[in-house]
Amino acid sequence: YIVPSTGRAENMQPPQIEAEKRIRYYITSGGARVVDHSTGEIIHEEILTPEDSARMCRVFEGRNIYTEIAAGGKIYLEKAVADHLEQYPVPSHHVWFIEAGRQIVIDKPSRYFSENGIGIEKVNMYGIPAGLQQQIYDEVEHSGVAHITDPVGENMQFFPQGLDRTRGIRKL
């Protein structure tokens, strides 16, 4: 088998990857999930708890930041942002995904993940205003549950603290 190991969520794999029959397993979201694509079985998962997911959503929620939230193999967008995507810096290599309508739009991410008992795999934030960059970085880094893998800047992503891609590879 070919096993792609990527930062993308499962449903954000390009159609060319999904169509490749030799690809049975995905290592997704930087190692947060290992999935048997043919059966849907989750082989390995390192995610935030639903409560920690809700807390981390409050870091960006309502701040008009284009944010992709990966959870359960899917990408979620905050409705207030999704309703006006033309105003946000959607990465060019993600446009196909948005145009295909594969994202799930939710009103208030913190409430949604808490009420539905869903844990987050990772979060990508794009176009963070300069005045919020350090604050968001500090909030995530001092949360005790998540870690930003990028330097302070307009684009940052975070994962569950302690995530180790090699654990998923070894389990597979």
Question: Could you tell me what each predicted segment is?
Answer:
Residues 1-91:
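Active-site phosphate-binding/coordination module
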Residues 59, 63, 70-172:
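Conserved acidic, metal-coordinating active-site core of Asp-based
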